[in-house]
From Swiss-Prot:
GO terms for MF: protein-L-isoaspartate (D-aspartate) O-methyltransferase activity
Positions of the catalytic residues: S75
CDD domains, per the entry: AdoMet_MTases
Organism: Stenotrophomonas maltophilia (strain K279a)
Enzymatic reactions: [protein]-L-isoaspartate + S-adenosyl-L-methionine = [protein]-L-isoaspartate alpha-methyl ester + S-adenosyl-L-homocysteine
Chief location bin: cytoplasm
Protein's recorded name: Protein-L-isoaspartate O-methyltransferase
GO annotation, biological process: methylation; protein modification process; protein repair
Family listed: Belongs to the methyltransferase superfamily. L-isoaspartyl/D-aspartyl protein methyltransferase family.
GO CC terms in record: cytoplasm
InterPro entries linked: PCMT, SAM-dependent_MTases_sf
C-alpha cells in the first residue's frame, strides 16, 4: 500500500520542512522499531509542518509531541506510526478516528487511500483541520461531536483509532468495530497509560494486547466550539 497523496510544491516547504529532514525522521522511526514501509512512506509524504503553528515549524520533524492549543497536542510521530502500522495489519478500508486534533493522524491514514471518518469535540481545532485537509486535497469526512459516541451511522468500521486516553476502552466505540476489525487506543490515567490493541474476531470473540507505554491527553466528554 503506497501513499496516494500528491502535494503541490508550495505544500512541501523548505529548510526544516525539506524532504531531507523528513527522511531523517523516517530513519529514526525505523530505528525505533517501525517496520511497515507503507506507514513510513506516509509519514515521509505528509507535511507535518502544516499541522502545527508556524512558530514551531523548526520542530515539526522531531519525534516529539507538540502543543496545538486548547490543551491538546499533535502526537509524537512514533506514536502515529505505531498506531497506523497496527491498523494496517488488518487491511482496513473504512477507519474511524476519535479525536481529530490537528488532523495529522487522519492525514497519514488518508494518504494511504483509506476511507477516513474523524470526530472532534473542539470546534476550533476541527475547523483548522478541515482547512488543512482541503489544502492537501484530502477527502476526509469530519464531524463536530463528542468522540466517545463514535459515528454509528457510518459504522461498523474496519479499524478505529482513538487519540486520547480513557480509563478503559469505551464500549460505544468497541460496538462500532466490524468483525475482523481492530481498535487501537491509549488506556489509563495520569499515573500511566498503555497503547492497547483490541481485535474483534469473526466468531465475535474479543482479543486484547498491550503494544507500548504511552502518554496522551485525556478523552473528554461533551463539545466545545
Amino acid at each position: 500500500m503506497s501513499p496516494r497523496l500528491r502535494l503541490q510544491p508550495e505544500a512541501v516547504g523548505i529548510g526544516m520542512t525539506s524532504q531531507r529532514v523528513r527522511d531523517r525522521l523516517v530513519d529514526r522511526l525505523r530505528e525505533a522499531g517501525i517496520v511497515d514501509e507503507s506507514t513510513l512512506n506516509a509519514i515521509r509524504v505528509v507535511p507535518r509542518h502544516l499541522f502545527i503553528d508556524e512558530a514551531l515549524a523548526s520542530r515539526a520533524y522531531e519525534d516529539t509531541a507538540l502543543p496545538i492549543g486548547h490543551g491538546q497536542t499533535i502526537s509524537q510521530p512514533w506514536v502515529v506510526a505505531r498506531m497506523t502500522e497496527a491498523v494496517l495489519q488488518v487491511s482496513p478500508k473504512k477507519v474511524l478516528e476519535v479525536g481529530t486534533g490537528s488532523g495529522y493522524q487522519a492525514a497519514v491514514l488518508g494518504a494511504l487511500g483509506l476511507e477516513i471518518y474523524t470526530v472532534e469535540r473542539i470546534g476550533d481545532l476541527l475547523r483548522q483541520a478541515r482547512k488543512r485537509f482541503r489544502a492537501l486535497g484530502m477527502n476526509i469526512r469530519t464531524k463536530h461531536d463528542d468522540g466517545r459516541a463514535g459515528w454509528a451511522e457510518h459504522g461498523p468500521f474496519d479499524a478505529i483509532v482513538v487519540t486520547a486516553a480513557a480509563p478503559a476502552l469505551v464500549d460505544e466505540l468497541v460496538g462500532q468495530l466490524a468483525e475482523g476489525g481492530r481498535l487501537v487506543a491509549p488506556v489509563g490515567g495520569p499515573g500511566g497509560q498503555s497503547l492497547v490493541q483490541l481485535d474483534r474476531r469473526a466468531d465475535g470473540s474479543i482479543e486484547q494486547r498491550v503494544l507500548a507505554p504511552v502518554t496522551f491527553v485525556p478523552l473528554l466528554s461533551g463539545m466545545l466550539d
